[in-house]
Amino acid sequence: AVARACNMTPSAVSKLISRLEKRLGVRLLNRSTRQFQLTSEGCQFYEQGIQILNGLDELEQSVTANHIPKGRIRIHTSFSYWTHFLLPCISLFNQRYQEIELEAHLSDEVINLVEQRIDVAIRTGPLKSSNLVARSLGSTYKQYVCSPLYIEKYGCPEHPDELHEHQLLDVSYQRQNKTWLFKKATQEVSLTPSKVLKVNHGEAILQLALAGAGIAQLNEFQIRNALQQKQLVKILEDWNIHASEEFHAVWIGHDKYVPNRVRTFLDFLVEHASIN
């Protein structure tokens, strides 16, 4: 992929990297017959190099005559955020910033921004990586829901312990079953589901819930219309834990040295694609 992007042969790229490693006196890549993986020194070199290049890009943009942001932005986001927030305003962005080319990669998994060469990623929950800069896009609440059809067939649980007898829906990219949390006044219940149908993104879980396939834990913005149209109903409302889930746009580098095209995209997200 690197060779194609640079219009070079793989062997030529490999030789350049080997020369760089020799000059630095450290190994930047771990090599195998099928893939390359960055070492910790390689990650550090890449991340600091990105900061330097971003600073040069910002300098170049600041001295050009028109200051028009341009170039490609590789973004990574979940299907849910793309569907409910980015997709409705992407045409406006393309119309407003015609010199910027967006390349979107959609999945609900947390990926390595360095390895996947991602400029901006949308992430939910606590931020674990200290080398990422973040900008808040707001927060939402999760609700436990199912369809009236499901209740008609299997009944409605009135206590979290009864969920062991029900079909639950959850994401599949976690190795272990996620703990579901419930709170009622001073009582707290944690449940690790045993009977779970798993799929790999939140919008598929929504569709399964609408089809009566089980009980799901979904973001409020995903189910708003379905609740209004009575396609879904909330369950265990007295037990729902009202903890918010934060959304952030994250990138590698320093907040001071962000390429003009990336800063433009971040500003657009805050204005048009924040969680309300």
Predicted segments with their positions:
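A late-sequence structural motif
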Residues: 237-276
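Acidic, Gly/Pro-rich loop/turn segments at junctions of secondary structure
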Residues: 105-199
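Central regulatory/effector-binding core of bacterial HTH transcription factors
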Residues: 70-133
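A short LG(V/I)-centered, amphipathic sequence patch enriched
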Residues: 21-38
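Hydrophobic hinge/microswitch elements
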Residues: 190-236, 242, 251
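Helix-turn-helix DNA-binding motif, specifically the short coil turn and the N-cap/start of the second
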Residues: 7-12, 16
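Alpha-helical linker/hinge and terminal dimerization helices associated
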Residues: 23-24, 45-67
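Conserved amphipathic alpha-helical core elements
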Residues: 20-21, 232
